[in-house]
């Protein structure tokens, strides 16, 4: 599938899949979306705590990188697991301008290390941030009550409805601790219904 790097409205870059006319992030702003959906509605709910996070769709690493930056401000200890079936290429990673757009030049090596680290191995990015990238299909996730927070950032329902099925959300429900939260950018009715069917009615969604 043909891919291209585009600039979103907030100046940050993303990957556009031409055949699907689908982007890895919102065209209105990749960084803006990550900060609003996953940080404001997710990470900040766990201030001053140790937080275990599962990201569904590691992609360009933007959510992981912003989480790293924000966790330093919030004095959080993070155990981050990012699941991705189709990793982005090294060339695409180099085209992402997140370090500059986030004024995070001092942490440029962290973003690089996130992508250069081996799959399926836990690495220590700092004293308070552990990262594991799992090369895995979403329907193979079998964690049980392991995570405080899930960033559900799969491609949209329009192009991959199977990723938004009740079966997938049952796996998400199983992976969350009893008081865990799932956050996602999508607010479609079918998504909310799937969440409710598996007993998760408190998730935060944002379009």
Report residues per predicted region.
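A short glycine-rich, Lys/Arg-flanked "PGG" loop and its adjoining helix->strand segment in the class I
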Residues: 162-179
């Amino acid at each position: 599938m043909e891919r291209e790097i585009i600039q979103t409205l907030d100046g940050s870059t993303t990957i556009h899949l031409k055949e699907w006319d689908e982007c890895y992030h919102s065209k209105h702003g990749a960084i803006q979306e990550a900060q609003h959906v996953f940080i404001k509605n997710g990470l900040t709910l766990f201030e001053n705590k140790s937080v275990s996070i599962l990201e569904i769709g590691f992609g360009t690493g933007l959510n992981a990188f912003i989480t790293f930056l924000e966790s330093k401000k919030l004095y959080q200890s993070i155990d981050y697991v990012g699941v991705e079936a189709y990793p982005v290429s090294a060339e695409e990673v180099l085209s992402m301008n997140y370090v500059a757009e986030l004024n995070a030049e001092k942490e440029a090596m962290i973003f690089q290390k996130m992508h250069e680290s081996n799959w399926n191995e836990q690495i220590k990015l700092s004293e308070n941030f552990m990262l594991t990238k799992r090369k895995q299909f979403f329907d193979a996730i079998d964690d049980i009550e392991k995570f405080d927070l899930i960033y559900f950032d799969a491609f949209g329902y329009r192009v991959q409805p199977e990723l938004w099925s009740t079966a997938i959300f049952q796996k998400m429900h199983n992976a969350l601790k009893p008081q865990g939260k799932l956050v996602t950018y999508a607010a479609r009715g079918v998504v909310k219904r799937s969440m409710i069917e598996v007993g998760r009615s408190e998730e935060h969604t944002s379009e």
